[in-house]
Amino acid sequence: VARGGKTKGRRG
């Protein structure tokens, strides 16, 4: 699921 911070290309 794409939710979290803006790092890792919006994955986590």
From Swiss-Prot:
Chain's role: Structural component of the virion.
Protein name stated in the entry: 14.5 kDa structural polyprotein
Lineage, opening ranks: Viruses, Viruses incertae sedis, Naldaviricetes, Nimaviridae, Whispovirus
